[in-house]
């Protein structure tokens, strides 16, 4: 089974980059030192889904940068952090909290592009879902129930939920009968659909743009009886304050001209490779915009706050 120090690279994940890797890229400039760049992505969905979503974009990057770009999908959020720390992942797509964790733990990485929503905003929310048939109407009704979270390095699936519960004077260890860390946003909703958890934390941009809607569009959610679930089978009982959108970051020690080329390739992607760009977000996002590490200072504060909460409980 994959763990933090191992990654999977499937044929589908590499996509067009497999063929491109055999092509003769120009071996001058920074490409001579970096005949291959590795792009790492956090496991927001299952491996096959990520591979299919990113394959055309890896093809575009390989052509644009004139060097092979390979997609590697981590089994958990920490694997992306550790991959960049070890220098094995040159470009990484993070969640806000996992990026903040990378900075706090000393990873020399620089954010250069931020996701932009269809309405031009650059943030999203953490929500608590329950099944619509559940009698639960508010968080306080969940005493003694099972809470489903995502990953300790997830913003919307762990850190923000922990912050919100604390602001309501709720200690998850005492309030819930059990807290299940499911490993991904998809797994959290699958656990809710199957009745394994009574409430699940997840990300939400808008009514038509969330992990829930993506999974529903794929027919991935079925109840314990095997029936395919619909949007009306789920209900949000709590929504967080706005969270800054996810960044893409490259290693700080890459050559300056390599970083400039990578950044420009991302900023130009929506125009130069519209289909590949659209596939990344199911057509929901606008072109990337520049971002810096400084923009994630509040997220760094958030994870440090949650770290202190966990230390007090230990």
Language model segments and positions:
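N-terminal export signals
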Residues: 6-26
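Pocket-lining segment of extracytoplasmic ligand-binding domains
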Residues: 146-148, 152-255
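Hydrophobic residues within well-ordered alpha-helices
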Residues: 84-85, 142, 192-193
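A conserved helix-loop-strand patch within extracytoplasmic ligand-binding domains
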Residues: 115-170
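Beta->alpha turn/N-cap motifs
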Residues: 74-77, 87-105, 114-115, 201-213, ...
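Extracytoplasmic small-molecule ligand-binding "clamshell" domains
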Residues: 29-100
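An extracytoplasmic/periplasmic, membrane-proximal ligand-sensing/linker region
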Residues: 30-56, 62, 250-314
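Periplasmic-binding protein-like
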Residues: 41-42, 118-127, 218-254, 260-263, ...
């Amino acid at each position: 089974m994959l763990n933090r120090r191992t990654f999977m690279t499937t044929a589908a994940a590499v996509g067009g980059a497999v063929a491109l890797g055999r092509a003769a890229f120009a071996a001058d400039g920074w490409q001579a030192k970096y005949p291959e760049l590795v792009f790492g992505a956090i496991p927001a969905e299952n491996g096959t889904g990520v591979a299919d979503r990113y394959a055309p974009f890896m093809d575009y990057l390989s052509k644009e940068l004139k060097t092979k770009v390979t997609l590697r999908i981590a089994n958990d959020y920490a694997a992306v952090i550790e991959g960049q720390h070890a220098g094995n992942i040159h470009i990484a797509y993070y969640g806000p909290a996992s990026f903040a964790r990378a900075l706090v733990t000393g990873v020399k990485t620089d954010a250069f592009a931020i996701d932009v929503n269809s309405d031009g905003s650059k943030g999203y929310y953490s929500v608590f879902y329950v099944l619509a048939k559940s009698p639960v109407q508010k968080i306080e009704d969940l005493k003694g129930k099972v809470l489903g979270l995502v990953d300790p390095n997830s913003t919307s699936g762990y850190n923000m939920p922990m912050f919100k519960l604390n602001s309501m004077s709720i200690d998850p260890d005492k309030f819930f009968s059990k807290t299940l860390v499911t490993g991904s946003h998809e797994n959290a909703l699958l656990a809710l659909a199957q009745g394994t958890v009574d409430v699940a934390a997840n990300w939400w941009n808008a009514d038509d743009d969330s992990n829930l809607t993506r999974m529903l569009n794929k027919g991935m959610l079925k109840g314990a009886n095997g029936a395919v679930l619909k949007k009306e089978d789920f209900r949000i009982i709590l929504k967080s304050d706005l969270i800054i959108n996810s960044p893409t970051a490259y290693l700080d020690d890459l050559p300056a001209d390599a970083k400039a080329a990578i950044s420009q390739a991302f900023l130009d992607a929506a125009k130069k490779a519209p289909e590949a760009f659209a596939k990344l977000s199911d057509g929901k996002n606008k072109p990337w915009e520049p971002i810096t590490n400084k923009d994630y200072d509040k997220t760094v504060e958030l994870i440090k706050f949650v770290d202190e909460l966990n230390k007090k409980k230990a």
